[in-house]
């Protein structure tokens, strides 16, 4: 068996090797991807991503990694900035998003946590028991495993020190595949080891009694005053919990932009302390402020801007930041700042390419965590970015010069690992333990093949050697430190090729992804991530995908992003919760709508099918073609037509006569959400003529409700018409009109994506009638399934497993739930049962391709692509030398050749499919048009899922043998891939046209 086969067998759906998962796990808060697309060849893209659910899963994955000598990397939330949690040599990435269990030992005041739980989650559990965290990293949404592995410090470190000071025990899977429990001094083996000595699977986190937190802020005019006050805090041992210092520029910007309670243009010291200590802390603060000329006022700490990631977000909103975390003794602060000022410009004057500012946290052992920021005007995808990244190195050098260290080592500063682990991180040196030596020796003895997180903490000898290029580049930066600006001006700039290439696929989404600071706040609120805790299903993962894609292009010279990958990262239900928490204010949901529309536009439209709805007198008597009241059934009910029959029976019970619009009608919903305006308007005009003079449209699906109530109202004005009708969901009409008793019956009500506008009203009326409603939010995936994404089954199963029997507002969702074995009905059917109406069954005569047919289409399409290209290999070989002119110019040369290739593919595949369609048609009563549509749909699916750069590899090998002169193979590959993608719609059109005459 191969690595892939063993992992798939062990983990099933929790093993992934698709492009989306791999790329979304190749980025963190720092600049590693930028190093890659600046030319340093570090393989940051994992080959496989696994989501363990248990310690047993982790042990099994480790054993596979050891067996095949494949590197393994643990991943929490990717909020670190030193590359700790992303690969340096591909391999297996362990994402702990599905190991998040937390329990509280109240007696010993310990939270027992799995590695994927966030500090915020642990704090919530603790507070429910009257306890809370003693300290946590500045990223509240980072994970327990990540915080311990990096031995972070952050909020509360003034009183409680590093994370290692607040860890009671850790259980790891070591490089022999054994489960080991570490306590006391032995924690030196794992705390700060960055996953190089073992994979954390459980930890005990120390807690304290809960107390409300008070905040006072002291503002000072000068740096000198602030530095003296920092010394006073240590000399007087003021019993605060956390102390944070904001520089003048940071204070001004956050105060003005986010209304934070800070004094603009001043140094602000925010002091946090338990309210129970207010009588001890406040008098001392007031005395210090009076002595050193400070002004005291009430502060606040609960805003997102309170943490370091918040500061980065605030500043990032106006330009790209280069920042560095360092640990120094507090007596070295002035020396550090003076040295940085010589290198970076004026302190407190943060402007593009000039000046810097700092954010400082006090740690209990007289250690300061200094976060220095400088701003640059260069785009992160500019070829000159490497020169600005050198400023990061210069800052690092200044920390080391004053006897300090980086906060973390990661892939960047192996030579300074001892400073970090033994000199500045005093948790273990105070116990007489040389942590650096403990980790180094254990690593050498137990992991000689460098399987565990290679390239981190220590210089690699076997694998991940690309990271060794970083110190060489750092040394160059230090050598030319005063010539960086000159070198930058003289060097050719412009966007890196990888970004230009990826933007062809993702458009504006690619631009905005560069603004993401990887704070992971969007992850915490994302309902789809809560349903399916996998990285691509959270906005952070979606944005990380882009930077990972740019890096992978730069690593391998080509990359094709199939539509299925775009559908996967954009296929959420656009609830907008992420928009509300994003500190950089990226319009995430709007971007995802636009991105999803790029795929939706390409999906072949299904043929109109009119199902018979009037099967008896009861249903037929409801229909009145002259009625001003319309029941819109529409094509969305094709997947669940029994709901339409039941709806007619309900309307009959209510005594209504309505005009019924059947299943062949299309409201234009898919065109509306896809941004296909012209097509939508065309359908809208047709429908408005059909429902002219109507005063009420009764809808059965939330999708049609949204289309008529929002889109028609807006778009009708563009065509000089007005949609005067009222739009009402049938469920709401029934609840308003019919009297019955709920008898305290419990119902799990699924609120479908496009029903949010009326869902609260429905819940209110159900409650008034005596039902106990449990609200279920989360997309079933029924509509997303039409957009090629793989989320649909996962989401439906996740909802069903959590809630059991479901009543949903969406007929499509009900059908989707049932298709994966979940008991589900629509609210319409539920209400019909309460009215004594027998719900209907409807057997739809349909046609679906079996797996063998799908496999055949895929095989023949790939075969035809290669055969058609191979037939043109000689002429393409003759043009290969022109590849030196670049992709865009070379495309112009070979475009006629690729057009001919596309035409040949279309003719060949059409011929093969025509005979199959004729054969299938003779075996079923289904209309041939439906059969043809299924074949065309499957061709479209294959085209939307294949990665053309991989498909082309055999052809490129053949081409190589035909070309005797020098040429740029990357240019040739990318030109052919791009042209094939651009002519995909032409290929579909050729096949559709050829098959229509079958």
Give the predicted meaning of each segment:
Residues 261-296:
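A conserved active-site cap/scaffold subdomain adjacent to cofactor or substrate pockets
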Residues 101-103, 113-115, 119-244, 452, ...:
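FAD-binding subdomain of flavoenzyme oxidoreductases
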Residues 42, 70, 75-77, 84-91, ...:
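Conserved glycine-rich FAD pyrophosphate-binding loop
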Residues 411-415, 656-682, 702-707, 733-736, ...:
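Short connector loops at secondary-structure junctions
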Residues 650, 661-662, 743-794, 863-886, ...:
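Redox- and metal-dependent alpha/beta enzyme cores, enriched for Fe-S-associated oxidoreductases
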Residues 721-741, 778-779, 822-854:
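Short, flexible loop segments at boundaries between secondary-structure elements
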Residues 1-59, 63, 79-109, 248-258, ...:
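N-terminal flexible segment immediately upstream of the FAD-binding catalytic core
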Residues 510-513, 543-721, 850-918, 922, ...:
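Iron-sulfur-cluster electron-transfer modules
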């Amino acid at each position: 068996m191969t690595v892939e086969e063993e992992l798939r067998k062990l983990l099933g759906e929790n093993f992934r090797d698709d492009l989306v998962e791999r790329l979304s796990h190749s980025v963190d808060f720092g600049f590693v991807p930028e190093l890659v697309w600046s030319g340093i060849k570090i393989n940051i893209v994992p080959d496989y991503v696994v989501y363990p659910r248990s310690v047993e899963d982790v042990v099994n994955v480790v054993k596979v990694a050891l067996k095949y000598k494949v590197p393994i990397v643990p991943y929490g939330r990717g909020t670190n900035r030193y590359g700790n949690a992303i690969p340096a040599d591909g391999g297996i990435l362990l994402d702990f998003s599905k190991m998040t269990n937390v329990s509280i030992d109240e007696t010993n005041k310990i939270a027992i946590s799995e590695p994927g739980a966030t500090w915020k989650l642990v704090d919530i559990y603790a507070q429910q028991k009257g306890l809370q965290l003693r300290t946590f990293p500045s990223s509240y949404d980072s994970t327990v495993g990540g915080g311990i592995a990096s031995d972070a410090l952050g909020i509360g470190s003034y009183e409680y020190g590093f994370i290692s000071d607040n860890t009671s025990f850790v259980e790891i899977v070591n490089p022999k595949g054994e489960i080991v429990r570490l306590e006391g001094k032995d924690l030196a083996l794992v705390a700060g080891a960055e996953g190089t000595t073992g994979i954390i699977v459980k930890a005990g986190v120390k807690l304290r009694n809960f107390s409300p937190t008070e905040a006072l802020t002291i503002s000072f005019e000068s740096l000198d005053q602030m530095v003296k006050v920092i010394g006073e805090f240590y000399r007087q041992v003021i019993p605060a919990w956390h102390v944070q210092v904001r520089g003048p520029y940071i204070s001004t910007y956050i105060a003005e932009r986010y209304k934070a309670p800070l004094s603009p243009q001043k140094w602000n010291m925010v002091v946090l302390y338990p309210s129970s200590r207010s009588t001890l802390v406040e008098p001392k603060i007031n005395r210090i402020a009076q002595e050193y000329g400070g002004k005291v006022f009430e502060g606040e700490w609960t805003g997102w801007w309170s943490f370091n990631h918040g500061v980065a977000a605030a500043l990032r909103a106006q330009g790209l930041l280069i920042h560095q975390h360092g640990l120094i003794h507090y007596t070295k602060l002035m020396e550090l700042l003076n040295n940085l000022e010589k290198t970076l410009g004026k302190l407190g004057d943060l402007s593009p390419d000039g000046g810097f500012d700092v954010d400082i946290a006090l740690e209990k052992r007289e250690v300061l965590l200094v976060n220095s920021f400088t701003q640059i005007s260069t785009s992160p995808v500019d070829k000159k970015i490497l020169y600005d990244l050198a400023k990061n190195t210069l800052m690092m050098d200044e920390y080391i010069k004053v006897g300090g260290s980086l906060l973390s080592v990661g892939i960047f500063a192996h030579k300074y690992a001892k400073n970090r682990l033994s000199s500045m991180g005093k948790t273990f040196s105070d116990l007489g333990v040389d942590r650096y030596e403990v980790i180094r020796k254990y690593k050498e003895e137990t992991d000689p093949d460098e399987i565990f997180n290679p390239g981190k903490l220590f210089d690699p000898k076997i694998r991940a050697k690309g990271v060794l290029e970083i110190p060489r580049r750092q040394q160059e930066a230090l050598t030319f430190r005063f010539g960086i600006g000159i070198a930058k001006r003289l060097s050719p700039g412009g966007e890196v090729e990888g970004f230009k290439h990826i933007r062809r696929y993702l458009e504006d989404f690619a631009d905005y992804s560069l603004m993401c600071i990887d704070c992971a706040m969007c992850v915490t609120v994302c309902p789809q991530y809560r349903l399916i805790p996998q990285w691509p299903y959270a906005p952070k993962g979606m944005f990380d995908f882009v930077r990972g894609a740019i890096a992978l292009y730069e690593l391998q010279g080509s990359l094709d992003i199939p539509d299925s990958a775009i559908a996967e990262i954009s296929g959420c239900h656009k609830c907008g919760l992420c928009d509300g928490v994003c500190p950089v204010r990226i319009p995430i949901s709007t971007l995802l709508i636009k991105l999803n529309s790029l795929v939706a536009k390409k999906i072949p439209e299904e043929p109109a099918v009119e199902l018979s709805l009037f099967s008896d007198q009861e249903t037929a008597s409801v229909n009145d073609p002259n009625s001003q009241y319309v029941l819109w059934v529409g094509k969305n009910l094709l997947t669940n037509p029994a709901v339409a029959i039941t709806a007619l029976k309900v309307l009959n019970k209510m005594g209504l006569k309505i005009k019924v619009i059947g299943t062949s009608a299309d409201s234009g919903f898919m065109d509306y959400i896809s941004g296909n305006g012209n097509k939508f308007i065309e359908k809208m005009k047709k429908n408005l003529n059909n429902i002219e003079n109507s005063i009420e449209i009764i809808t059965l699906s939330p999708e049609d409700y949204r289309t008529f109530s929002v889109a028609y109202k807006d778009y009708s004005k563009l065509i000089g018409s007005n949609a005067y009708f009222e739009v009402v969901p049938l469920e709401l009409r029934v609840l308003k009109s019919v009297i019955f008793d709920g008898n305290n019956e419990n119902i799990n009500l699924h609120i479908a994506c496009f029903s949010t506008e009326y869902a609260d009203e429905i819940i209110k009326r159900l409650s008034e009638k005596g039902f106990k409603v449990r609200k279920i939010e989360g997309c079933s995936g029924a509509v997303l399934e039409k957009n090629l994404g793989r989320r649909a089954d996962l989401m439906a199963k996740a909802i069903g497993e959590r809630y059991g029997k479901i009543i949903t507002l969406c007929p499509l969702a009900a059908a989707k739930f049932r298709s994966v074995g979940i008991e589900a009905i629509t609210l319409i059917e539920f209400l019909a049962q309460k009215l004594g109406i027998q719900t209907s069954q409807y057997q739809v005569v349909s046609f679906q391709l079996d797996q063998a047919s799908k496999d055949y289409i895929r095989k023949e399409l790939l075969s035809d692509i290669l055969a058609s290209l191979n037939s043109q290999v000689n002429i393409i070989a003759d043009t290969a030398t022109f590849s030196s002119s670049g992709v865009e110019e070379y495309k112009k040369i070979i475009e006629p050749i690729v057009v001919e290739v596309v035409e040949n593919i279309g003719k060949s595949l059409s011929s093969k499919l025509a005979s199959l369609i004729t054969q299938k048609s003779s075996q079923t009563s289904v209309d041939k048009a439906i059969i043809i549509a299924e074949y065309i749909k499957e061709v479209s699916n294959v085209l939307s899922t294949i990665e053309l750069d991989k498909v082309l590899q055999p052809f490129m090998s053949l081409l190589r043998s035909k070309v005797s002169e020098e040429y740029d193979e990357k240019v040739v590959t990318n030109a052919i891939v791009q042209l094939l993608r651009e002519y995909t719609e032409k290929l579909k059109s050729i096949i559709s046209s050829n098959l229509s005459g079958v």
